[in-house]
């Protein structure tokens, strides 16, 4: 077994205090997202999306956050993908934003709700044309005999859609994750990290500090 126990670091970028917290967690998330973008982090919108299958086996993958507001967090995917199939059976999911250079992370527990075709189309039309074509090509999570099969289909579809707009595939969609709780983690000195969790109580958010 490879021993990694000597890899460690100190966290000294500053703490997080109760007095600094807004009542709405999405306000704090918006601030932290802005700061992550201003710091020019690599893929600041990247988040880990966790789902479970019908046997309770968890799966995780990195997906890009495309929109957020007070209602929740939006991402898009192939509706035939493993994540979409698992959401159809159990829409409870978790999201995780790992902003390591800022010594921060955000964890979200919530329920995924399918977006309307109108909402999906509105976003789909903003994608680069090659990305739109790629959505038609990949049967996400299915097995491939070789990469050449995927590339061949891409160029076939690229020729097919050479003129005009690329239509929205019926098997491509998106989700709004409505948060039930949002935890903010800020690294602290001596491993005394600051953790605050917002838990939804009807129309209000309850704020609690958690032990590190």
UniProtKB/Swiss-Prot annotation:
Gene Ontology molecular function, alphabetical: FMN binding; pyridoxamine phosphate oxidase activity
Cofactor(s), names only, from the UniProt record: FMN
GO biological process entries: pyridoxine biosynthetic process
InterPro entries: Pyridox_Oxase, Pyridox_Oxase_CS, Pyridox_Oxase_N, Pyridoxamine_oxidase_dimer_C, Split_barrel_FMN-bd
Protein's gene: pdxH
Positions annotated to bind substrate: 8-11, 66, 123, 127, 131, 191-193
EC number(s) from the headed UniProt entry: 1.4.3.5
Protein name: Pyridoxine/pyridoxamine 5'-phosphate oxidase
NCBIfam families: pdxH, PRK05679.1
Role played: Catalyzes the oxidation of either pyridoxine 5'-phosphate (PNP) or pyridoxamine 5'-phosphate (PMP) into pyridoxal 5'-phosphate (PLP).
PANTHER family: PYRIDOXINE-5'-PHOSPHATE OXIDASE (PTHR10851:SF0), PYRIDOXINE-5-PHOSPHATE OXIDASE (PTHR10851)
Annotated Pfam families: PNP_phzG_C, PNPOx_N
Family per similarity comment: Belongs to the pyridoxamine 5'-phosphate oxidase family.
Organism: Shewanella sp. (strain W3-18-1)
